[in-house]
């Protein structure tokens, strides 16, 4: 099962569409254009992308969002099922099938978004403050953030994770194995 009809909070990229229009930068449609947008914003002194990495769940969701294609393969599903099964008493570590590629993609994402050690201290309030003040064009967040900023008069939209293989993924809470 890849999809179930339930209510969920979608997690992906909250985007200040107004900044994109103001600087003539196209909205990303794939990973390459996401990286190009980040670079274009940095050239004008605006952070292209950031996230509240002080929280471990943000790091995990980013890793999962970038690797959704692998995590939905047979090997990925087998690993996730064993890892998350509360009845499983065997220790389940990271395998050598799914995870090497996942960490390679995360390393590339860190480079492409120019993540630094200072970013690891960003809280939700820090990140949304940067976004609200036009200091960041995109941040990792939930679909609820779009409405919050739209209510404040900021032209905001929501984009998925762009996989380097061309696929697009949105993380949801709750999630299903």
Show where each model-derived region lies.
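Paired acidic/hydrophobic, glycine-rich loop segments that form the ligand-binding mouth/hinge
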Residues: 137-142, 157
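Beta->alpha turn/N-cap motifs
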Residues: 52, 124, 141-146, 174
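Extracytoplasmic/periplasmic substrate-recognition and gating elements
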Residues: 22-23, 112, 150-177
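A local structural motif
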Residues: 22-27, 107-122, 135, 152-155
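Short helix-initiation/N-cap motifs at beta->coil->alpha
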Residues: 31-36, 117-132
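Pocket-flanking alpha-helical
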Residues: 1-3, 13-14, 35-50, 59-61, ...
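Glycine-centered hinge/linker elements that transmit conformational signals in sensory
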Residues: 38-40, 81-119
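Periplasmic solute-binding protein
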Residues: 1-27, 53-86, 171-177
């Amino acid at each position: 099962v890849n999809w179930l009809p339930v209510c969920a909070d979608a997690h992906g990229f909250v985007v200040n569409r107004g900044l994109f229009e103001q600087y003539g930068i196209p909205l990303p449609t794939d990973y390459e254009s996401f990286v190009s947008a980040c670079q274009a914003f940095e050239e004008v002194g605006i952070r292209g992308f950031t996230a509240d990495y002080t929280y471990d769940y943000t790091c995990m969701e980013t890793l999962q969002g970038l690797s959704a294609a692998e995590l939905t393969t047979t090997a990925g599903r087998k690993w996730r099922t064993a890892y998350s099964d509360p009845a499983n008493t065997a220790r389940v570590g990271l395998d050598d099938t799914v995870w090497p590629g996942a960490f390679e993609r995360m390393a590339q994402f860190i480079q492409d978004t120019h993540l630094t050690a200072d970013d690891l201290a960003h809280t939700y309030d820090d990140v949304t403050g940067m976004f609200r003040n036009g200091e960041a064009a995109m941040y990792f967040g939930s679909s609820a953030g779009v409405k919050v900023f739209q209510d404040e008069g900021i032209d905001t939209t929501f984009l998925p994770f762009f996989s380097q293989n061309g696929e697009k993924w949105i993380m949801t809470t709750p999630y299903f194995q």
